[in-house]
Amino acid sequence: LSLRSLNVPYLAAHPLELGMRLHDQAAAGADDDEAGASEPAPRLARLLAASPFDAAIHDAAGRLFERSAFQLYDEPSAAPSVDAWFPDGGAIAAVKRILRTAPVREFPATFVVGPGDDGIALVRLLSHWMVRRHYARVKLKLMGLDPEQDARRAAGIARAMDAGGAPRAWMCVDFNGAYPDADSLRTFLEEWRRDHPETYADLQYLEQPTSADSRGGEVDWRSGPPDKPVLLDEGLVGMEAFAEALERGWSGAALKTCKGLSFMLAAAAWATPRGALLTLQDLTNPGRAA
């Protein structure tokens, strides 16, 4: 039994194609007028609302054919909504090339330090999760109100790790698009490097330092790129935005299936041969299971 051999109208397209149609419709806000909304819903909210249906399409196809939905990428098929981005064999074949032959069963977990985490409580938290639970990665959320203040906070987190006996850790920083321009990020990096060079060396990448209200590519890093990779997060909303961002010096993107499994697969398949840095992020909070 194969996707092509089953002549059922509602399965006439590959799950990737159906998911990309859903993504494009949600990104464009195509249903807002029909729903009589007084103003369009935020684009990220629309993508988030649509994503469970995208996952359900893949899940339903996998159940129908009694195999992993990802095995449906083994067969050549058309995906007209996104094939134009893959002139060398189409999107289905491109996704197939980046899929692992076996799923990853274990991967490093990341401890997230929020804006309100501070003082002795933070020292205890870091000691618990990094020393006792063996977390080796830290994601630092910053408000982005003042780059010098943010740099001091980043260095303070590093000192809290030292005080709690935590080992050197892999680190990343997420600004949620708070900085107004590229110069603010450069100031942040310069101050952190000056204040705490040891942990600055552990900083791996930066997520969405500037606004995602418009296309992420509008900030141009080519004139003076930072010495750390800069990734799209909230700004990753479509293939066009991703392509423009890479042209303007962005390093890659944070992939989250909560914005659509099909789009994330297509984005990863398109970006991988171009050498973009990609991080796959799951928002699960393991709690005591960790």
Identify the function of each model-found stretch.
Residues 43, 47-48, 106-124, 142-144, ...:
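Active-site mouth loops of central-metabolism enzymes
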Residues 1-71, 75-79:
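Metal- or metallocofactor-binding catalytic centers and their adjacent structured scaffolds
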Residues 99-104, 131, 222-224, 246-247:
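Solvent-exposed alpha-helices and their adjacent loops that cap or buttress functional pockets
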Residues 68, 125-143:
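Catalytic domains of carbohydrate-active enzymes, especially glycoside hydrolases
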Residues 105-108, 131-139, 167-172:
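Glycine-rich, often proline-containing surface loops adjacent to acidic residues and nearby aromatics
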Residues 1-3, 57, 61, 129-130, ...:
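Hydrophobic, Leu/Ile/Phe/Ala-enriched alpha-helical segments that form helix-helix packing faces
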Residues 140-284, 288-289:
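Catalytic core of soluble alpha/beta enzymes
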Residues 44, 58-65, 69-120:
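Glycine-rich, aromatic-flanked loop segments that form ligand/cofactor-binding clefts
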